[in-house]
């Protein structure tokens, strides 16, 4: 009886239901993922998120600020006094606020703070063009120097030397380059921390800076990207830093001397035209008005002076002399010996 109850009567409807159950079960089994595949996919999506959190870079402004800001921590920089000798590889001019250095040569820069920054603070270095017409462009190395470099950061102009903790970034929005290094407290007996920077392209390189002046910005930042202090200085990468510094400082002194002389002296009149100065009385005749004429060269000045003295003398005795001189009878004829040529 039990076997009879378990067996269903074989008909067209029961066979159709049985066939559908068999087909759906095999289809579901074929679509089911292999064991452990779902967990592997979850691990795959979790790793990039954690990597992005560890390498999170704060969004940089479109145009970085170039004003000096000491902040609450008294952030400041100090450069070595290398002088203007031809043998120096880097030298800083206080008068110009400008660093002169050679290509790929290490430049030590001292970092000073009055109060220690928070734990994990970093020092960020980036460069921008000085002139407003170029400030929107990214400062990077020329194609020639990039082709000679096989490193991952070959397009970056600024390198940090002597530290394995340096990190190089490229902002996803502005494409500007920057490099960070962790802030280290000064050693015993020292008031500052020294970082080593090198600039990997000349200022005159075609396709790179192309003789356009640049500014380097050093900022003291927290791990979240908050700026605690900022210092800015101009940089020129050249073959002879001492010579170029001496030349530019000399040009600055010459321009300053010329401006001082111009302020002390009266404004020079225009040499192309004679400027008419107003006379003391506005009712005087036009012939009595005084004019000023600037003359170049002493000999020419003496010649005009003698001419002017003669004219002044004629003005004093003018009426008598004019009466004694006979006028010609015609504009085309000259009087010779007091008789007509006819």
Swiss-Prot record:
PROSITE patterns: P53
Region of interest called Disordered, as start-end residue ranges on this chain: 244-287, 318-342
Region described as Oligomerization: 288-317
GO MF, one example: DNA-binding transcription factor activity, RNA polymerase II-specific
Annotated InterPro entries: p53-like_TF_DNA-bd_sf, p53/RUNT-type_TF_DNA-bd_sf, p53_DNA-bd, p53_tetramer_sf, p53_tetrameristn, p53_transactivation_domain, p53_tumour_suppressor
Residues that bind Zn(2+): 142, 145, 201, 205
Subunit structure: Binds DNA as a homotetramer.
Short sequence motif named Bipartite nuclear localization signal, residue ranges: 261-278
Positions marked as site (Interaction with DNA): 86
Keyword Nucleus attached: yes
Name this polypeptide is given: Cellular tumor antigen p53
Motif, Nuclear export signal: chain positions: 302-313
Gene Ontology BP, a term: apoptotic process
Natural source organism: Xiphophorus hellerii
GO cellular component terms, semicolon-separated: cytoplasm; mitochondrion; nucleus
Gene transcribed to yield this protein: tp53
Species lineage: Eukaryota, Metazoa, Chordata, Craniata, Vertebrata
Keywords assigned by UniProt, alphabetized: Activator, Apoptosis, Cell cycle, Cytoplasm, DNA-binding, Metal-binding, Nucleus, Phosphoprotein, Transcription, Transcription regulation, Tumor suppressor, Zinc
CDD domains, per the entry: P53
Region (Interaction with DNA): 236-243
UniProt region (Basic (repression of DNA-binding)), positions on chain: 319-336
Chain spans, region Transcription activation (acidic): 1-35
Subcellular location, record wording: Cytoplasm; Nucleus
């Amino acid at each position: 009886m039990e076997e009879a109850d378990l067996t269903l009567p074989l008909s067209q409807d029961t066979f159709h239901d049985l066939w559908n159950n068999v087909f759906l079960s095999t289809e579901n089994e074929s679509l089911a993922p292999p064991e452990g595949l779902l967990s592997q996919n979850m691990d795959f999506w979790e790793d990039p998120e954690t990597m992005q959190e560890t390498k999170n870079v704060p969004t940089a402004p479109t145009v970085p600020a170039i004003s000096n800001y000491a902040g609450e921590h008294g952030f400041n920089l100090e450069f070595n006094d290398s002088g203007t000798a031809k043998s120096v590889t880097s030298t800083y001019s206080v008068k110009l606020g400008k660093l002169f250095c050679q290509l790929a040569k290490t430049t030590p820069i001292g970092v000073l703070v009055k109060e220690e920054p928070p734990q994990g603070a970093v020092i960020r270095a980036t460069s921008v063009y000085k002139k407003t017409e170029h400030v929107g462009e990214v400062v990077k190395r020329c194609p020639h120097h990039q082709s000679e470099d096989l490193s991952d950061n070959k397009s970056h102009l600024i390198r940090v030397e002597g530290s394995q903790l340096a990190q190089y970034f490229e902002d996803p929005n502005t494409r500007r380059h920057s490099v960070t290094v962790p802030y280290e407290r000064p050693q015993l007996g020292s008031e500052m921390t020294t970082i080593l920077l090198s600039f990997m392209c000349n200022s005159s390189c075609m396709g790179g800076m192309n003789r356009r002046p640049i500014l380097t910005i050093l900022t003291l930042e927290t791990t979240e990207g908050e700026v605690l202090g900022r210092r800015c200085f101009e940089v020129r990468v050249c073959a002879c830093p001492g010579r170029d510094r001496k030349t530019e400082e000399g040009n600055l002194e010459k321009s300053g001397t010329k401006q001082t002389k111009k302020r002390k002296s009266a404004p020079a009149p225009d040499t192309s035209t004679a400027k008419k100065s107003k006379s003391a009385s506005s009712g005087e005749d036009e012939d009595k008005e005084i004019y000023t004429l600037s003359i170049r060269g002493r000999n020419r000045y003496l010649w005009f002076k003698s001419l002017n003295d003669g004219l002044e003398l004629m003005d004093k005795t003018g009426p008598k002399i004019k009466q004694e001189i006979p006028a010609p009878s015609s504009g085309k004829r000259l009087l010779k010996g007091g008789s007509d040529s006819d």
